[in-house]
Amino acid sequence: KSHPIATEDEIGWAMVKELSVNAAKLFEPEFEKQNGRNGRLSIQTDPRNFRNAKALTDQAVEFSQLAKNMIVKIPVTSEAIAAFEEATYQGVSLNATVSFSVAQTIAVAEAIERGLKRREAEGKDISQMGPVCTIMVGRVDDWVKVGAEKMGAKVDPEILEWAGVAVFRHAHKVYTERGYRTRLLSAAFRNHMHWSEIIGGDSVISPPYAWQVKINELGITPNLNSVNEPIEARILDPLLENFPAFRKLYDVDGLKVEEFTHFGATLRTLRGVLQSVNDLESFVRDVTVPNPDK
């Protein structure tokens, strides 16, 4: 009623913004306690703009102003890398999403570093900025398994469960060595190792609630320095030798920036998040144009 002439799309995004503002308030005490490092609420930019760096930058700036503890998600496509630098320069704390490979995490971190250095050169404050780069570890596993299925590869199934962990540990090693100010974030859990086998670094490990319950019920005692340990050769060698897709994900130069958008794992995930936009519009439509047959 407060938006009588708004489109379904406009109403949907108004809902996203209002819900995000309300949720962000819950995290404000932790945000203040951690001086911006933690206590943030992630809000997603419109994934339909995945090829438009300016649109992503503009929306990231808009969303960052909704609350002081917003962190804004931008997908790691080829076209979006420029947005990571520019939005950072404009003071936005970013969460890089739709990200699966060491190469993507490096491109993000380098772009954010450029943005931070531009701010520093102009005397602009960065003390409360807390950028993160997600690795969708479970979707790494998923994509390697798709490749294994297509190839008819015969390997110990346990090995495939380590693909996301291996990529995360390698990226963490690179981040530590290069001193990036962006932190890694683990997302898209598929097994407890996406928590228990990547602990001990300056990273964000935040299992969804359902996984927190499972982990507690399992009573697992994690290795508190697991992220800094090398992957066993019996696991890593077969992954590198048998699965070209895994090597693209694992190697520092496995993907070129111009390959990010059309990489298989990216396309799979983009299709999912784009469908979510359609689902949001459908949800609004059921309210604004209710089905009279029900």
Where are the predicted features?
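Domain-level signal for soluble alpha/beta catalytic cores
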Residues: K1-G12, L41, T88-V92, E113-L116, ...
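Short, compositionally biased low-complexity segments
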Residues: K1, G138, D142, P244-D251
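Catalytic alpha/beta core domains of metabolic enzymes, predominantly
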Residues: S93-V227
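Structural signal for hydrophobic packing residues in well-ordered secondary-structure cores
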Residues: A24-F31, N35, S64-A67, I112-E120, ...
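General structural feature for long, well-ordered alpha-helical segments within catalytic domains
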Residues: L19, A23, A55-Q59, A83, ...
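Active-site beta->alpha loop and helix N-cap motifs at the rims of alpha/beta catalytic domains
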Residues: K1-F84, Y89
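Catalytic cores of large soluble enzymes that bind and process phosphate-bearing ligands
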Residues: E8-L19, A23, R51-A55, F100, ...
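C-terminal extensions of enzymes
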Residues: N225-K294
